Amino acid sequence: MEPPGRRECPFPSWRFPGLLLAAMVLLLYSFSDACEEPPTFEAMELIGKPKPYYEIGERVDYKCKKGYFYIPPLATHTICDRNHTWLPVSDDACYRETCPYIRDPLNGQAVPANGTYEFGYQMHFICNEGYYLIGEEILYCELKGSVAIWSGKPPICEKVLCTPPPKIKNGKHTFSEVEVFEYLDAVTYSCDPAPGPDPFSLIGESTIYCGDNSVWSRAAPECKVVKCRFPVVENGKQISGFGKKFYYKATVMFECDKGFYLDGSDTIVCDSNSTWDPPVPKCLKVLPPSSTKPPALSHSVSTSSTTKSPASSASGPRPTYKPPVSNYPGYPKPEEGILDSLDVWVIAVIVIAIVVGVAVICVVPYRYLQRRKKKGTYLTDETHREVKFTSL
């Protein structure tokens, strides 16, 4: 009899795992007989929330994203097919919003980046030569709500104009009556007559022109007296640029007399600060070449450190030349013998060779005589006489 209060489970213990397995099989079958999430696109987005799976024949719809607009008749929907894939669809039906067309500015150009006016791209502006840009050089196509507009107003190209060039002391320029100069308009400067004996020199470029950004091409020149001293080179002479006076950019050339060499440049120019550039050269005396022949050495001269050389009969400082200690290359010195010119190890080799040769000459005959004695003589037991015989 079963104990009271205990009820029997209506399902045997083996049935619960079986039911769970059956449910998983049914769920797997339902998944395998469906489509996964629909594809995503750059220009379109799914209407509604996506599901983990879709049944066969189920349809999903798309709409154009912000910044894009729909152009029919291309489809913007797809259907889950029997082979568990989505029918082909693309976002070609959605086009980017474009900004309004911009004309080329007068005397300039508007260049769209990548050749398009679509939002997210840029428009670059450039002006023709002789004109400069007023405004933003780059505009951006942006979205304001659902409309694409440019980030600013298009710039304009203005003609390059320059104010009159500066006036200079002791000089003037052409077109001094003109108040406004256009691009590449040029003026030329010149110096006034000098009140003294030396004229004014024009330092700098005589002609300048109105350039980019309404700025003159160079700084204005100046007029002043430039006079260099007469160049004098001792032990030399002037070979070109002769004159009594040397003004701005005067050029002179020099050469030295025989027995002298030039220290410096042979050509000098009178600079704007009334000095020669480079400095006036010098002509220095050519020193005689030093003798390279070593003095003759006597065999009677001792090499001891205590031996003193004989005093020179000439007064003044003694020469610092030291005779070389090496032998003449190839042959011994005339005053040396053959043995003096040989190295110690060479002499040692010769001595050893002589000793070995003498030893060989002495030992060979001795050994020969010893062998002859052993073969040709013997002593008898009776008379102990020496008997000689000759073998046949």
Curated annotation (Swiss-Prot):
What are the protein's UniProt keywords? Complement pathway, Cytoplasmic vesicle, Disease variant, Disulfide bond, Fertilization, Glycoprotein, Hemolytic uremic syndrome, Host cell receptor for virus entry, Host-virus interaction, Immunity, Innate immunity, Membrane, Phosphoprotein, Receptor, Repeat, Signal, Sushi, Transmembrane, Transmembrane helix
Q: Which N-terminal residues, if any, form the signal peptide?
A: 1-34
Kindly state the tissue distribution recorded for this protein: Expressed by all cells except erythrocytes.
- GO biological-process terms attached to the record: adaptive immune response; complement activation, classical pathway; innate immune response; negative regulation of complement activation, classical pathway; negative regulation of gene expression; positive regulation of gene expression; positive regulation of interleukin-10 production; positive regulation of memory T cell differentiation
**Chief place of localization:** membrane
Report whether Metal-binding shows up as a keyword of the record: no
Q: Where in the cell is it found?
A: Cytoplasmic vesicle, Secretory vesicle, Acrosome inner membrane
Q: Where are the transmembrane segments?
A: 344-366
Residue numbers on the Cytoplasmic membrane side = 367-392
Q: What highest taxon heads this organism's lineage? A: Eukaryota
Q: Outcome of altering C228Y?
A: In a colorectal cancer sample; somatic mutation
Q: How does it sit in the membrane?
A: Single-pass type I membrane protein
What note about domains is in the entry? Answer: Sushi domains 1 and 2 are required for interaction with human adenovirus B PIV/FIBER protein and with Measles virus H protein. Sushi domains 2 and 3 are required for Herpesvirus 6 binding. Sushi domain 3 is required for Neisseria binding. Sushi domains 3 and 4 are required for interaction with Streptococcus pyogenes M protein and are the most important for interaction with C3b and C4b.
Indicate what this protein is called per its UniProt record: Membrane cofactor protein
Which species? Homo sapiens
- Gene that this sequence comes from: CD46
